[in-house]
Every structure is written in structure tokens, then in C-alpha cells.
A protein has these predicted regions:
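Short hydrophobic alpha-helices and adjacent helix-cap/hinge residues
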Residues: 1-322
Length: 322
């Protein structure tokens, strides 16, 4: 090979990584801020991916994603959010709890944020209003606190003899403040409500052994993810009818759930992320709320608990798992 050809070839090869870096620099980056652990977010990531695809984005093709996981340690979220901002991501998606959304909001007033959690975003100061969020943040609300009276009603219908219902909350989650309204809802049904706090595995075990007639698990990343199997196994051991918001709960051999389709709502969050990356402003995108809710019951689990499900309850169920 002639010297001139060799120099030309060498110069071209040296330019390849420069061109690749330039292309990489022009690719938008999504910061993914999760309250739980990576292994527990597969369904959420899949749903977000579907929404992003609808909006024209595919991870590693025309979108890069920086993942940060708090592993259920809420105190880590502020530092993780600040780290994403320092990495100069183009947008942040927060999921798992309102704590992650609050951490993201505290970390930046300029980087757009899309949240998805079960808390009231107005009550917790995330947005100015549902229709006009304002600022740099919008997202998806599963409105779980507003569903508590209905969930208590369903637990009472499940077993009309129910006199006491324990409500499990995580005191490290700001949505623990929702508990104040639960007692009034129980009083209207003639049911005594007592709040059980738990933020560790040991406390979860103690909570299930409190001697209530039924257990309602308030939304929290710890309960929905790592604690789900533990709670359900303890509920089976103590023959305690238990309700969660998570729609996959009965399908895993557990008893009942009542709530929104979180997979579809997370898909909508992905669409919002894509729209913002294409130039729309979070302040102009109303907070999405579910319009339909589903009741699911597992009859095999009911039999194992010694429960005979009333016909009136089964008529309300959207899905009955034999």
C-alpha cells in the first residue's frame, strides 16, 4: 500500500469514533428514576417502551436511557435525581412512588419531568392543577387514595361480618398522610380502621399479625414489589383476606385487587415522554387519570382462606380466576 493511501485510510478510521460520538451527542437521553429495584421494573419498562414506540422512539436506536434505582431506599432518591440532572438528560421519568417524583422536581426546574405513581399530584405539590400542571412536570396519576373507600366497601361486601380492617402504609412515603381519611371511610361502613405502619420486611410480618378481619395494602413501591409475595404468603398463613391495587396480584395466586390498568397508564407515560421530546411542554399536557377500574378475584385463593365469595361480589368482578 502506498504511503499516501495508508495515511488517508488511517485518517478515515480515526474519524469513525468522532462521527459516532457526534451522532450519540444528538440522541436524546431519558433519565429513568425508579424507587424500587431494576428486577422489579420489567413490566413498567415494557409498557413505557410501547408508549415511546408509538411516539416514534426506540431505545438504543434514537433514544438513550440512563437508569437509576433506589432499591426501596427513598433517602437515595434526591442524590439519584441530582445525578441525572448533572448528566444533562433531556427528560426524567419518575416511577414507583411520589417520593421519586418529588425528588426529581426538587432537583430541577428546567429539565422536563413525567411521573407515574398512585398519589394525588396536586395534594403533594407536584403540579398546580390536573388540567394545567404548570412548570416542567406532568404525568400519570393512578389516584389510589381516592379509591380507598371503594376498596373498603368491597372488603366489607366480600365478608359482611368484617368488623376491623387494617390498612398498611409506609411511613416513609408521603402518601402515608392519606391515612387520615381512611378512618372516616370505614366509619361510614360500620368498620373500625386501624393504620399499620411498615417500612421493612420485619415490620411487614408484624403488620399482618395484628388480628384484623381483613387487610388493605395502600400503594407503595415496597409493598407493590418486594413485599407483595411476602404479604400474600403471610396473609395465606394467617387466613387474612387481603386487597392490593396491583392488577397482577390475584393472577399470582393471591386474593383480590381493585384498581386501574397500570400497564396501560405507563404506556401513556411513554407517549407523553415522546411528545415532550418532540417539543411539547409539560405545562400544556394535563395529568392523565384512569377512567376505568377493574375488580379481580382468585377463587382458588378464596377457598384456601376458607372464604365463600358472595354472589353479589362475583357479579361485580371484572375477572374471576378459577
Amino acid at each position: 500500500m502506498k504511503r499516501r493511501e495508508f495515511i488517508t485510510l488511517l485518517g478515515g478510521a480515526a474519524a469513525w469514533p468522532i462521527a459516532a460520538r457526534a451522532q450519540h451527542a444528538n440522541t436524546p437521553v431519558l433519565g429513568f428514576l425508579g424507587s424500587a429495584s431494576e428486577t422489579r421494573y420489567e413490566a413498567t419498562r415494557t409498557a413505557i417502551g410501547r408508549g415511546l414506540n408509538e411516539a416514534g422512539f426506540v431505545e438504543k436506536r434514537n433514544l438513550l436511557i440512563e437508569y437509576r434505582w433506589a432499591d426501596f431506599r427513598y433517602d437515595r432518591l434526591p442524590a439519584l435525581a441530582a445525578e441525572l440532572v448533572a448528566r444533562r438528560v433531556d427528560i426524567i421519568f419518575s416511577t414507583g412512588s411520589v417520593v421519586s417524583a418529588l425528588a426529581a422536581k426538587a432537583a430541577t426546574t428546567t429539565v422536563p419531568i413525567v411521573f407515574a405513581n398512585g398519589s394525588d399530584p396536586v395534594q403533594h405539590g407536584l403540579v398546580a392543577s390536573l388540567n394545567r400542571p404548570g412548570g416542567n412536570i406532568t404525568g400519570i396519576s393512578f389516584i389510589n387514595a381516592q379509591l380507598v373507600p371503594k376498596r373498603l366497601q368491597l372488603l366489607k361486601l366480600l365478608n359482611p361480618k368484617t368488623a376491623t380492617i387494617a390498612v398498611l402504609v409506609n411511613p416513609k412515603n408521603p402518601n402515608a398522610a392519606d391515612a387520615k381519611s381512611f378512618e372516616a371511610a370505614g366509619q361510614a361502613l360500620g368498620v373500625k380502621i386501624f393504620i399499620v405502619n411498615a417500612s421493612t420486611d420485619a415490620e411487614l410480618s408484624e403488620a399482618v399479625q395484628r388480628g384484623a378481619d381483613a387487610l388493605l395494602v395502600h400503594v407503595d413501591a415496597l409493598f407493590n414489589d418486594r413485599g407483595e409475595y411476602q404479604i400474600a404468603d403471610l396473609a395465606a398463613e394467617y387466613r387474612l383476606p387481603t386487597m392490593m391495587a396491583n392488577e397482577t396480584f390475584p393472577g399470582r395466586g393471591r386474593l383480590i385487587s381493585y384498581g386501574a390498568d397500570t400497564r396501560d397508564l405507563n404506556r401513556q407515560a411513554g407517549v407523553y415522554i415522546g411528545r415532550i421530546l418532540r417539543g411539547e411542554k409539560p405545562a400544556d399536557l394535563p395529568v392523565v387519570q384512569p377512567s376505568t377500574f377493574a375488580l379481580r378475584v382468585n377463587l382458588k385463593t378464596a377457598k384456601a382462606l376458607g372464604l365463600s365469595i358472595p354472589e353479589a361480589f362475583l357479579l361485580l368482578a371484572d375477572e374471576v380466576i378459577e
